[in-house]
Amino acid sequence: MKGEAGHMLHNEKSKQEGHIWGSMRRTAFILGSGLLSFVAFWNSVTWHLQRFWGASGYFWQAQWERLLTTFEGKEWILFFIGAIQVPCLFFWSFNGLLLVVDTTGKPNFISRYRIQVGKNEPVDPVKLRQSIRTVLFNQCMISFPMVVFLYPFLKWWRDPCRRELPTFHWFLLELAIFTLIEEVLFYYSHRLLHHPTFYKKIHKKHHEWTAPIGVISLYAHPIEHAVSNMLPVIVGPLVMGSHLSSITMWFSLALIITTISHCGYHLPFLPSPEFHDYHHLKFNQCYGVLGVLDHLHGTDTMFKQTKAYERHVLLLGFTPLSESIPDSPKRME
């Protein structure tokens, strides 16, 4: 009997090992095929974009050289325009459109895409005015001086207003590095701000909005704005010694992305704001930007059990995800 039992256990163990190796081979095949497909697709996309970039590169290079001639000897003014004024123009233009929706509720169809239904319909005008004043203060008294002080460091490291524009592939590499640096610095600074010592005096201000809107992406205590909003975005260009053109695009993109993350609407063809919206709702989940460090540290486990996680995808149609993936019906007591 013992021999038969041992033989059966051995066979069962062999079958399990076979299943494991089979699963590993299938996984390797799927991942390998997926990786090859992604590389082929990426090479195709970048080839076409590179052709466009190259074809228009002469035009942009000529315009850049014209700007250098215009601001010769006053490159710091050009840096100020590119690193501060242009990103701010993008920020307020985008938020201006969102504020029309937030304050009037029009166009009506936008409300179908609201993440937290019934919240900010319409937004409290007193609370909104206070938030806008804080955002303007942070931009004028924190963001502007930090970017101004950034210029001499960049000038010493590698002139941001150098004559030659970066290549397309170099900018893609920079963008990837900027994003990774931002993820690390924002995640850990954000978690630190949730420590009771700092939360009550500093970070609580930002969490006054449990259902966020776009403009409050920069609504924060000045210390938080400097440490958690500005530094994670600034460090990347400083490390890379980036060209002003890269800095302008990166700062503008960062402001647009953080606005989308806070806007409160899961709109078609825009990045999903479900992740950060859930953070404002629950406070102790989803601290990062990409979600990579949240996954590694287990600070997204509750989020992954929700409908918000199922909806955390790029919406490629016009049917709101709250309708295609509705909330589970509440249990009757």
From Swiss-Prot:
Down-regulated in primary acute myeloid leukemia (AML) patients. It is a multi-pass membrane protein. It is found in: Cytoplasm; Membrane. Residues 176-299 form the Fatty acid hydroxylase domain. Keywords: Cytoplasm, Membrane, Transmembrane, Transmembrane helix. InterPro entries: Fatty_acid_hydroxylase, Sterol_Desaturase_Related. It comes from the Eukaryota. The chain crosses the membrane at residues 29-49, 77-97, 134-154, 168-188, 215-235, 237-257. One of its GO terms (molecular function) is iron ion binding. Promotes megakaryocyte differentiation by enhancing ERK phosphorylation and up-regulating RUNX1 expression. Belongs to the sterol desaturase family. This is Fatty acid hydroxylase domain-containing protein 2. It comes from Homo sapiens (Human).
